[in-house]
Design a protein with these regions (language model features):
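Conserved actuator
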Residues: 1-14, 28-31, 159-171, 270, ...
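Conserved catalytic phosphorylation-site environment of P-type ATPases
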Residues: 34, 69, 82-156, 304, ...
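Conserved ATP-binding TGD loop and adjacent catalytic N/P-domain core of P-type ATPases
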Residues: 7, 16, 27, 105, ...
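Helix-interface capping motifs at the ends of transmembrane segments in multi-pass membrane proteins
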Residues: 40-78, 102, 375-401
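Actuator/coupling domain of P-type ATPases
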Residues: 1-72, 363-369
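Conserved cytosolic headpiece of P-type ATPases
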Residues: 12-16, 20, 83-97, 124, ...
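P-type ATPase nucleotide-binding
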Residues: 135, 139-263, 273, 285-301
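Membrane-embedded transport module
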Residues: 344, 349-424
Length: 424
């Protein structure tokens, strides 16, 4: 048996995951910076309270020893350990839970923003659908046969990673058609591709408008709701291909989970409005838009954010990259384009919408845990410092109480692991 190593340990998928976890856990969320600011004020205030306790106790008791014991108890019980652990403990537990579900947040700030998301925008092809479209129908222009149509289309699409391109290439291969060489390629985002194809001419593949013609009005049935790729050569129609794609098995459940916690789910796609409406009906989405260019998607996301919404965008293609970058939190599906992955703030390793629901719910739980931890830390100090100042807590008991507060914060953070197992 022969084995070939294609990457060093640090360059493997596991190495990437460990590096991402380390970098994310080392970053600070905005809420953590707030705790740091409070701690910076808290320490001198506690020192002042300890001195005041010493002075007043000595004044009223006449015993410097008793005064010193009370002052030391104040210092011990007010150690800001719990306050310092409140946020990083929750972030580490939350990041670990997310990584365990195959979700990579690039840093703690992204995770905090994800915990505040109230609107999710989803792409259609390859995100909500399986991304493995099958050819459902063909239309050939007069005088054109299937061989010419698939030669032209496969020549253009042979270097594309779009699901429709892969479907065209697979169909050409099934028919024994090899893509002829193509040169001088050009891509218009959200519209289509074109190139010079040997023996055919300047070929375009994409939306009918991009290819310079309209589909015949008598095309009915699947043509009304399918994704369509038109093909032309030198400005003349060669034909068109209708694709049928199915929903991912977990798409409906993921949308329902998000809606159940009050998150509005929208769909934006560059596909035909009829095809988008069909998927929206199956998923129960009230807001769905089709025929959107990459710029349209990004602008729509910005408009939602201008309304005060915290928006998450999920997609897998190059056409989604501008919207992913514009959103408060961009989620890219692993296996999509490199541009989408680099534009996003987080990566869904299994490439499913179910993972997106997991990510947002874990992020919400993490943010809730941080708030709980900060409350525990502040409540503990508000209660314990007066008791220590009046001599109701000895330094030994004060030390035990301080340790207990830290353990409480850590224990509360560790609940995130069980939360992730329960909701995911």
């Amino acid at each position: 048996v022969e084995y070939r190593a294609e990457a060093l340990g640090g360059d493997t998928l596991l190495g990437d995951m460990m590096r991402a976890l380390s970098e994310a856990q080392g970053s600070k969320a905005p809420i953590a910076r707030l705790a740091d600011k409070v701690a910076a004020v808290f320490v001198p205030v506690v020192l002042a309270l300890a001195l005041l306790t010493f002075a007043l106790t000595w004044l009223f008791s006449g015993s410097p020893v008793t005064a010193l014991v009370h002052a030391v108890a104040v210092l011990v019980v007010a150690c800001p350990c719990a306050l310092g652990l409140a946020t990083p403990a929750a972030i580490m537990a939350g990041m670990g839970a997310a990584i365990g579900r195959g979700v990579w947040f690039k840093n703690a700030t992204v995770m905090e923003r994800a915990g505040r998301v109230d609107t999710v925008v989803l792409d259609k092809t390859g995100t909500l659908t399986a991304g493995r479209p099958q050819i459902a129908a063909l239309w050939l222009a007069e005088g054109v046969d299937e061989t010419l149509l698939f030669q032209a289309a496969s020549a253009i699409e042979q270097h594309s990673r779009h699901p429709l391109a892969q479907a065209l290439l697979a169909a050409a291969a099934e028919r024994g058609i090899s893509p002829p060489p193509a040169s001088a390629p050009y891509s218009e985002a959200g519209a289509g591709l074109e190139a010079d194809v040997a023996g055919i001419g300047r070929v375009r593949v994409g939306k009918p408008e991009f290819c310079g013609f309209r589909l015949p009005e008598n095309l009915e049935g699947i043509w009304q709701i399918a994704s369509v790729a038109a093909v032309s050569a030198d400005g003349k129609a060669l034909g068109a291909v209708a694709f049928a794609d199915t929903l991912r098995p977990d798409s409906a459940a993921a949308v329902a989970r998000l809606q159940a916690v009050g998150i509005e789910v929208r769909m934006m796609s560059g596909d035909r409005p009829a095809a988008v409406a069909q998927i929206a009906t199956e998923l129960g989405l009230a807001a769905a838009q089709g025929a959107m260019s990459p710029r349209d998607k990004a602008e729509a996301v910005r408009q939602l954010m201008a309304q005060g919404r915290v928006v998450a965008m999920a997609g897998d293609g190059i056409n989604d990259a501008p919207a992913l970058a514009a959103a408060d939190v961009g989620f890219a599906l692993k296996g999509g384009t490199d541009v989408a992955e680099h534009s996003a703030d987080a990566l869904l390793m299994n490439g499913s919408v179910g993972q997106l629901a997991d990510a947002l719910l874990v992020a919400r739980a993490t943010l809730k845990t941080i708030r709980q931890n900060l409350f525990f830390a502040f409540f503990y100090n508000v209660l314990a410092i007066p008791l220590a100042a009046f001599g109701l807590l000895s330094p030994v008991i004060a030390g035990a109480a301080m340790a207990l507060s830290s353990v409480t914060v850590l224990g509360n953070a560790l609940r995130l692991k069980h939360f992730a197992q329960r909701v995911c």
